[in-house]
């Protein structure tokens, strides 16, 4: 099993959710998060420039609101889910997001006590 964590633009969250549902992956968690990439957030240029260098630095280094999807799938579905997330979110611009894939050693369905890959299958149980 793998955990897929995708950090994406806020305006792409609904379409990402819709595509995952259409592909048969209805189980995921969405969180509101703040972050920034290598660009250190968006820089706003002011005309005229800000007279205080500290204020200018604060303006350029900020956190951007994002959405974080967490999806646990069996190994055979990782490529499909990752590809669908990329298709929806890739614009070619900085800030499109990141996807992380991690191993999951165990999953337990609290309601039934069931464990293993059966807890993350596509069928409704």
From Swiss-Prot:
This is Nitrogen fixation nifHD2 region GlnB-like protein 2. It comes from Methanosarcina barkeri. The keyword Heme does not apply. One of its GO terms (cellular component) is cytosol. GO terms for biological process: nitrogen fixation; regulation of nitrogen utilization. SMART domains: P-II (SM00938). The keyword Transmembrane helix does not apply. Keywords: Nitrogen fixation, Transcription, Transcription regulation. Disulfide bonds: none annotated.
């Amino acid at each position: 099993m793998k955990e897929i964590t995708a950090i994406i633009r806020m305006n792409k969250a609904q379409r990402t959710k819709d595509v995952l549902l259409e592909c048969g992956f209805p189980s995921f968690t969405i969180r509101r998060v703040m972050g920034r990439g290598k660009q250190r957030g968006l820089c706003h240029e002011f005309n005229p420039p800000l007279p205080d260098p500290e204020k200018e630095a604060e303006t350029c280094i900020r956190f951007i609101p994002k959405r974080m999807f967490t999806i646990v799938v069996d190994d055979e579905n990782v490529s499909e889910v990752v590809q669908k997330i990329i298709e929806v979110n890739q614009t070619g611009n900085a800030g499109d997001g990141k996807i992380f894939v991690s191993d999951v050693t165990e999953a337990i369905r609290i309601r039934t006590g069931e464990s293993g890959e059966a807890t993350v299958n596509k069928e409704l149980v």
